[in-house]
C-alpha cells in the first residue's frame, strides 16, 4: 500500500501542490497552484536522511553527460505564463529545465538529472520569480544597485553619469565619452545593465554616434526639449539602428499638445515613461496615450498605488528633481500642473485593466529604486480590495491578477527593450536570474537572489555564528557578486551597431555584451496580459478620466500591506 500523507504535512515537507492556496505576505492576494510537475512519492529534497543522496535521488551522471550545476527543488513558480510547482535545473548560468529533478536510474519522470556535481537550493515552501527588470533608472549613485538587488531586481536600464544636475532630472547618458565610462563602471556591478543616450536632437548625427558608442536606447526628456522635431529625428534613428526610444513629454505644452506628440510619433513604437503624468508629460491628458497600439505605457513607482500621502509628497520631489526654484511662481505652477488626484486614481484602474503595461522606479528622481516590486503588488492588493476579483479570476484565487502584475516588472519591460530572449521570465534557455521568496515576505524582502546561476544576495545571519541563522539577519551580498565571478554572471546590453564596432574590445570590457533586438517591431499587443487598448479621454476642466466612456476613479488607500509591518525605519 502506498503511504498516505495529509495535505498539510505534504506542504510542510515538499511545499504546496496542485490546488493548495497561499496568501502573499500581508496582502489580500491569494495564489493557487495550477499544476505540480514533481512526481508524488519520487520528490527530491536535500538534507540528512532525505532524498538527494548517492544512489537515491542523486545519480552517477557527470556534468559532461547532462547533470545540472544547480537544482532548485520543489519551488512554486509565479510567472506570466503560469503558477506551477516544479524543480528548476540550472547549468552554465542558464535555466535548462523546469520539471522533475532526480536520478533517472531510480525515479520516475525525471527531466532534470542530479549528479555528484550538482548543488541544491531548497525551494520547498518558497515562491520563485524571474529577476525584476527596472527600465527607468537615473544612475545617480552606484549604491542604487545594491538596493535594487536587495529588492529582487536583477536588470537595470536607464541613463545618467552620477549626481550631475542633468542626471538628477533626466534618464540620459549623453555622448560617447559618458556612455563609455558608464559601460566601464558596469564591470563592477552585479546586475545586468543598459544605458540610454540622450535622444533630444533634431538631426541624426549625434544620436547615431551615441548608439554606436554603446547606448541600448535613446531617451527624449522635456528638460532637454522634447519637440515634434526631436521626436521624429530620434525615432527615425531608432528605426534604422534597432534601439528603443523612451519619452518624457512636454508638460507645459510649449511645442504642442498630446495630439501633436502622437502625430510626431507617426505610429512608431515608443515607450512612454510615467504615462499618467505626475512624473512629467502633457498636462493634463498625457494619460490618453495608453490607448495607442504603438505605445508601450509604463508607470513610475511614486504614484503606485494612489494613497492619502501621494499628492502631498510629490511637490517637494518635483522641485528638487527638476532643478526648480520654490521662490519663482512659474516654477511652482509648473510643478503643481503635474499633480492631479484624478489621473493618479485612474492610473490604478488602468493597471488593473491591463492598459498600463510596465512599472519602473524613476530612481532618486521622484522614485524609489528598492520598491518597484513592492509598489506593484501594493497596487494589485488595492485594486482587489476596491474592485474585487478580475473577470478571469474566481473566489478561490487571484491567479490572473498576479500573473498580470508580475508581468509588469519582468517580461513586459524585457519585451519593450529587446532583451526578452535573455531575461524576463522563467523559461529554458534564459539567463538564470531568479528570486526566491518566503510567502510571508513576498514582494518586500527576497530570501535569495540568483544571478546568472550564482547566488549574489541572500538573507544572512551573523557571520561569526555557528550556523547561518542567528541575528541580526539581513540581506547581504554573496560570492557571486565578488571578484571575477561577477562578469560571467551579468550582461551589458548595447546596440547592434556597438557590437559591430567591437565596443567590448574598444573599452576593455570583460562582461558579456549583448545586442538588444527587435525593439522596433514590438507593439502593445505583444505585451503579456497587459495589452488592453481602451479609448481614454480626460475632461480638461475636472481632469476626470474616462475609458471607453466609463469614468475611472477610486479612493486613495488609507493603509497598505508590505509597508511598516516589515520595516523598522
UniProtKB/Swiss-Prot annotation:
The modification N6-carboxylysine is found at residue 219. Disulfide bonds: none annotated. Heterotrimer of UreA (gamma), UreB (beta) and UreC (alpha) subunits. Three heterotrimers associate to form the active enzyme. One of its GO terms (cellular component) is cytoplasm. This is Urease subunit alpha. The lineage of its organism: Bacteria, Bacillati, Cyanobacteriota, Cyanophyceae, Synechococcales. It comes from the Bacteria. Residues 131-569 form the Urease domain. Pathway: Nitrogen metabolism; urea degradation; CO(2) and NH(3) from urea (urease route): step 1/1. Keywords: Cytoplasm, Hydrolase, Metal-binding, Nickel. Its EC number is 3.5.1.5. Belongs to the metallo-dependent hydrolases superfamily. Urease alpha subunit family.
